[in-house]
Amino acid sequence: MSSPIQTAIVQTSETSAARLPLRVDRSAPIPQVKSEHHVLVRVLAVALNPNDHKMVTHFNMPDSIAGCDFCGIVTESSSNGTSLSSSAGARLPVGTRVCGALFPYSPEDPDNGSFAQYCVVDARLLVRVPDSWSDLEAASLGVGWSTISLAFSDPNALGLEGLPTQPSHRAKEPVLVYGGGTASGTLACQLLNLMGYTPIAIASNQSSELAMKYGASATACYTSKDCVDTVKSLAGKPIRRILDCITDAESAAICYSAMARSSGTYACLEECPDACRTRRIIKVKEVMGFQVLGVDIKLGDSTYTRLGDQKLMAIGIQWANEIQALMESGQLKAHPLRELPGGWEAIIEGLEMLRNGEVRGQKLVVRIPQE
């Protein structure tokens, strides 16, 4: 008996500067539920992230399904079809609308990505979507919150106090957010406010208003020659914690210059080369949101290779509950969205747009055809 198949966006071996190595495959395998903690989700909508085009370009794995962010409906909660006997089924029964994120860009799990009709996810890292949130809004959250959760709550990263629903920080300490107008930046600003911190955003002049709308207490323009002095003045006290949502030579230089003279922690969302680490006293943490999954990611001699860490997964599970509570209470809002019509092909076209730098201040989202 043949295995069930689905439509999905998969990687190809074709390399071209003009087009990403992706195609629509209408005979991709449907992933199987792996444990009592996992559920099968029918995908309703997906969001596109820069790592989706970066990973298929630099770590190409032909025939592997792509995609991280999603919103969908639980359709199976154990190996026994629609059984509700598992721990996952008890928490998220069949028919529940959920959102979350995967990391399909590793050889260990090539048949499980969000750019597909179905995906398998650990239910402990899923968020139940309230009626007040649309499929597209919910699809935009997974990668963002999982990454921010580790940047904030991992003691080896920023190690912030408390949680959004249980704030314990009282000093209103400034936290610098470089890239405050990005999807990660606007989410970080919202969560920092809820946790009792004071987010100061670095953004372009065009994105300044957006960052302020999402909770930044003040902004500085990264193109200004006075950017660092402005940031220090806005903070009013030494900055000891910085989140860099961009992570390139320019952003690292500004962040390092803005950091307190005595010490501080710099959490970045991409690799920070040694050449950018100009002050040894500053602690650096390259945050990879996929570590909330608690599994090994093996991508050769790169910063993306990480061993599974159950402590980081525990942070992710805790934050999944936090995000759900914030969504239900109306304390969280999605980054501005731009829906791309066209289904499967729109996903590939949208990733090309991201690669070419054609998207600013918006998160690209696509509805998955319900064939």
UniProtKB/Swiss-Prot annotation:
Enzyme class: oxidoreductase
Protein induction: Expression is induced in complex medium (Czapek yeast autolysate medium) supporting calbistrin production.
Catalytic activity, EC: 1.-.-.-
Cleavable signal peptide: none
Domain of life: Eukaryota
GO MF term set: nucleotide binding; oxidoreductase activity, acting on NAD(P)H
Pathway noted in the entry: Secondary metabolite biosynthesis
UniProt KW keywords: NADP, Nucleotide-binding, Oxidoreductase
Binding of substrate, residues: 145-152, 289-293
Pfam families noted in UniProt: ADH_N, ADH_zinc_N
Biotechnology: Calbistrin A has been reported to possess a number of interesting bioactivities including antifungal active against Candida albicans and cytotoxic toward both healthy and leukemic human cells.
Binding site for NADP(+): 51-54, 181-184, 204-207, 222, 269-270, 359-360
Function: Trans-enoyl reductase; part of the gene cluster that mediates the biosynthesis of calbistrin A and related compounds. Calbistrin A is a secondary metabolite with an interesting structure that was recently found to have bioactivity against leukemia cells. It consists of two polyketides linked by an ester bond: a bicyclic decalin containing polyketide and a linear 12 carbon dioic acid structure. The polyketide synthase calA is probably responsible for forming the decalin moiety.
Quaternary structure annotation from Swiss-Prot or TrEMBL: Monomer.
Cross-referenced PANTHER family: HYPOTHETICAL OXIDOREDUCTASE (EUROFUNG) (PTHR45348), TRANS-ENOYL REDUCTASE STHE (PTHR45348:SF1)
Family: Belongs to the zinc-containing alcohol dehydrogenase family.
Name by which UniProt lists this protein: Trans-enoyl reductase calK
Organism: Penicillium decumbens
Lineage: Eukaryota, Fungi, Dikarya, Ascomycota, Pezizomycotina
